[in-house]
Amino acid sequence: MFNNLKPAIAAFALAASLALNAQAAEVTGAGATFIFPAMSKWSSDYNKATKNKINYQSIGSGGGIAQIKAGTVDFGSSDAPLKVGDLTASGLAQFPSAMGAVVPVINLPGMKAGQVRFTGPLLADIFLGKITKWNDPAIAAVNPGVTFPDLKITVVHRSDGSGTTFNWVNYLSKVSLDWREKVGEGTSVKWPAGLGGKGNEGVA
């Protein structure tokens, strides 16, 4: 983990849109995978206190937004906040329910936690596919004294509509003009490099 990058890529507050159906014996929701562990605990506590159930499906922020707009669930959750115009047009309310951070991690044999450092532009170049080897001079330049193997870098990212993706590419767009012009921002982008996994569990 690269702790020095945490403040720069802190996630937006999770936005939850609530449809008015408070009398339902079972409340249904869908959306961000990021909040699923907390949602599971809240659902359990809510059930103990009220005897009512919350059925939350962690299908990704994009799916949650689509379902709450379609009216197929009582609430949706997304790491990427909706704009005021979008909320008004859909008749939705939005409020923050949790906050988290997106932190890049690596799986490189022989490296200790916190040993490898990156800059924002360097991360952008890796995700753009411009830097493909661990022993690239650009990586070595910001990691003096660290010897990197001649191994290919395999980038892993979300394949589904994701608030985690939104937060990550929003950061890359701020630190890299090349990323901003070629890829841009959104809950779903055309990734220049890497393998896609569905949900945070798929990436892990």
Please state what every model-predicted region is.
Residues L5-A22:
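Hydrophobic helical h-region of N-terminal Sec-dependent signal peptides
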Residues A24-A204:
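Flexible loop/hinge segments at secondary-structure junctions
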